[in-house]
């Protein structure tokens, strides 16, 4: 039964983990907007999610726990999976070699934030529905 519950929540869990990682990458791009030679980075979210889901099924028959902080107690958990970072190709290269386009980064940051919040909402509604069923509700 627990494996069915895990399977029901696996997609949202992994999507949220990747969204959080992407948010950190986008924040680093924004923080380094004025750093000469800094190369803006990002991930291909869809392909990374697919890789994580396939890898989770192959390794454990499910998706393993993910450590999000070095202060967490490891319990058969693995650290966040390494994602393939891609370099952004700038529309207009700057003279100092920095490839951060602040308009694009802010847009991507806001879009990723909204999708993260949507993922939390969907996960919350899935959990609420499961609790309703477990409590004998309609």
Curated annotation (Swiss-Prot):
Protein's name in the database: Flagellar basal body rod protein FlgB
GO CC annotation terms, alphabetical: bacterial-type flagellum basal body, rod
Subcellular location: Bacterial flagellum basal body
Similarity section: Belongs to the flagella basal body rod proteins family.
Task performed by this protein: Structural component of flagellum, the bacterial motility apparatus. Part of the rod structure of flagellar basal body.
Species annotation: Salmonella typhimurium (strain LT2 / SGSC1412 / ATCC 700720)
Main location per the UniProt record: other
Subunit structure, interactors included: The basal body constitutes a major portion of the flagellar organelle and consists of a number of rings mounted on a central rod. In Gram-negative bacteria, at least four rings, L, P, S and M are present, whereas Gram-positive bacteria lack the L and P rings. The rod consists of about 26 subunits of FlgG in the distal portion, and FlgB, FlgC and FlgF build up the proximal portion of the rod with about 6 subunits each.
Disruption phenotype: Defects in flagellar assembly process.
Biological process (GO), any one: bacterial-type flagellum-dependent cell motility
Alphabetically ordered keywords of this record: Bacterial flagellum
